[in-house]
Amino acid sequence: MSKESSPPKVPSTTMEYERRLEAAAEIILEKEAKFSNTPPDCSEFGVTATLKPHQVEGVSWLIQKYLLGVNVVLELDQMGLGKTLQAISFLSYLKFRQGLPGPFLVLCPLSVTDGWVSEINRFTPNLEVLRYVGDKYCRLDMRKSMYDHVKKSSKGHFLPFDVLLTTYDIALVDQDFLSQIPWQYAIIDEAQRLKNPNSVLYNVLLEQFLIPRRLLITGTPIQNNLTELWALMHFCMPLVFGTLDQFLSAFKETGDGLSGLDVSNDKETYKSLKFILGAFMLRRTKSLLIESGNLVLPPLTELTVMVPLVSLQKKIYTSILRKELPGLLELSSGGSNHTSLQNIVIQLRKACSHPYLFPGIEPEPFEEGEHLVQASGKLLVLDQLLKRLHDSGHRVLLFSQMTSTLDILQDFMELRRYSYERLDGSVRAEERFAAIKNFSAKTERGLDSEVDGSNAFVFMISTRAGGVGLNLVAADTVIFYEQDWNPQVDKQALQRAHRIGQISHVLSINLVTEHSVEEVILRRAERKLQLSHNVVGDNMEEKEEDGGDLRSLVFGLQRFDPEEIHNEESDNLKMVEISSLAEKVVAIRQNVEPDKEERRFEINSSDTLLGNTSSASLDSELDEASYLSWVEKLKEAARSSKDEKIIELGNRKNLSEERNLRIEAARKKAEEKKLATWGAHGYQSLSVEEPILPDDVDSSSDAGSVNFVFGDCTNPSTVSHEPAIIFSCVDDSGNWGRGGMFDALSKLSNTVPTAYHRASEFKDLHLGDLHLIKIDDNDDQQNTQASKPLWVAVAVTQSYNSRRKVPRSSISIPDLESCLAKASFSASQKSASLHMPRIGYQDGSDRSQWYTVERLLRKYSSIFTVKIFVYYYRRSP
């Protein structure tokens, strides 16, 4: 054998580490084999539910591992297999069979805390559970209650609960308290949160918390690489699995795909790792359970629909690349900046989703209309899909990665008058649970929202906030408008509908923009899923080389002719083709035999649907030379476009200089007279001048934000710890109102109504005026942080005429925009955040006005890079 063909030598320390793991696995499996095969009767330790065979087997496995002193991972194939019931049945065993007094700790996402409490109360009613969530004051009250209980109770039962249920974030915030409790068992639900061994959460739980016995529940032990697998196994058994370097040295080839080892050695490595994992991990896949007859689920059909970009999207897509041209040229010559590259990818993905994700793209005035749908190829296809799904009586889970995309989709739902629920990271736990209950309430007579508004047609969910733990089997269709970076997250999200309790054929539709960065992400997702299957599944398949970051960005660009990008007819989508596509996609649920093959469709000018079961391939022909050729074309097109804009702007400058001078002279004279009167009476205006909008606004910038919160906007200290401006609308009557914001601002400081009255007295109260009133520390009765500057911005946006039938007018949108611009500019100058009630609902305005207001908020938060908080007022029960 030649030197080149000889397999590399494996270091002895690596062999020793691997053999040690194999020996530990052998000991565990041998002892486990000696246990009785008689399944436990869960009713004997207080479980009221009838468990399915695979659930009984899971509880039995947990019991055996506990008795052997082994901490384990329970992987339930993207969930949906009753993991909560198995976990609480096991806790009931510990409490009532083993006699452990507790306490037991359960960590899980906020969105599923209600589900855990509900199942504990229903199926293990003898277990006392405490849901330790809420704001810091609520949790402080719970801690005081625990302390009082401990003082009064005997040593036999010193805590008022058996199970404490809380979230990962609260575990970190309240670690000083929670880490002092000697937990007799801990369950980490959705344990993929522990995939990063360098994270604060990982190390705090491992080093600070008293949790010697642990169970990790996950549907995705491997999401990106073997480091994540080691992190979970090391968290369970730190002494057994040693260091990360040892683990990677022993099993690195299983994650590399092309390892340099011969095939036989490669297979042996897979075999060894799978054997070791078998002692510490129980993997329950739906496919195996269905094949064995232990689980019956309705069919699942998965489709990928390749959607083209419309003309506006192409313009934005290429303009992003044009803007990033210097960085891309640096990449093509070998340089790279990972952070910069990621930012470009994010902007390209936004262009694929919807152009209105970029400030300044939506045409003004901001009004609901078909322009919202026509601006995005994805939304055009989604529109046709939802129309047919609604008419057919189906219900839909609509997943998006970005919450800003959900904002646009929500506007679309309002435009089409579809009933919907929404769940994202900003929704409080109580509202989440209510939304899930509302959506899950089925009716027997279809989904006509006008007949029964309690049953939403669509449940819109941000993948990261609601993609795990929820039970939404009321839906039989799942649509992914955007794909998560991690394919396992989308797989988990799909299980919200395709799980135990589902009785309908489930259709999953993945919308992917063809010939774009999204298609590259799709391909890489397939490779990540293959890695997971290789290590903990049954097959092994060599993976291909990575396409490279530059090729990912410029994938498909050779199909974009820069000279035709501005020609809308060159890529005009025919509604007949889209309609035909939607018809076939929706009908496929009835027309095809269920199988595991993922089908892929694309819109095509000659053939509306093209089935393509092969993976999306990276463009091997796109080398540096062809890319640079495209760049030169793009530069030429950019220069041509710029010249046209200069000519167009030049033609618009046709103003009368003489007229402007006359107006300016009259204004100056009136201003001097007014200031003289004010000076004589000691009045100083608090009105803010018109801001000068910056010329270099980056329309693709993510700076600034609009946040929706619950609470009182006149007490912003609970949300923000920075200087704050409270924004409130008034009329021009000079009469300070009563109730609502008027009373709240008067209570905050008498300075506010006084300043308003003074402005009216000196005729300084006009529509579009914004008066910025400083709240002195002595006057501020609510602000608990005396050192934090606070202002009130009184926006004059309504006229008042006593002779009108309704004296006070509705809010004037142009005047509101002027006030918002001034307030945002002032906030930017003072490094402050902006706080306001939900404008547009106060005076009974319709939904379309709020659509306009929300767009204006996003516009000026982006221009002046300020944070705006919109408050939903929670009324007392």
UniProtKB/Swiss-Prot annotation:
Its EC number is 3.6.4.-. The keyword ATP-binding applies. Coiled coil: none annotated. Keywords: ATP-binding, Chromatin regulator, DNA-binding, Helicase, Hydrolase, Nucleotide-binding, Nucleus, Transcription, Transcription regulation. It is an enzyme of class 3 (hydrolase). Residues 381-548 form the Helicase C-terminal domain. ATP binds at D77, Q78, M79, G80, L81, G82, K83, T84. It is found in: Nucleus. It comes from the Eukaryota. Pfam families: Helicase_C, SNF2-rel_dom. InterPro entries: ALC1 (IPR031053), Helicase_ATP-bd (IPR014001), Helicase_C-like (IPR001650), Macro_dom-like (IPR043472), P-loop_NTPase (IPR027417), SNF2-like_sf (IPR038718), SNF2/RAD54-like_C (IPR049730), SNF2_N (IPR000330). Its main location: nucleus. GO terms for biological process: chromatin remodeling; DNA repair. Residues 64-239 form the Helicase ATP-binding domain. The keyword Transcription regulation applies. Probable helicase-like transcription factor. Belongs to the SNF2/RAD54 helicase family. PANTHER family: CHROMODOMAIN-HELICASE-DNA-BINDING PROTEIN 1-LIKE (PTHR47157:SF1). This is Probable helicase CHR10. It comes from Arabidopsis thaliana.
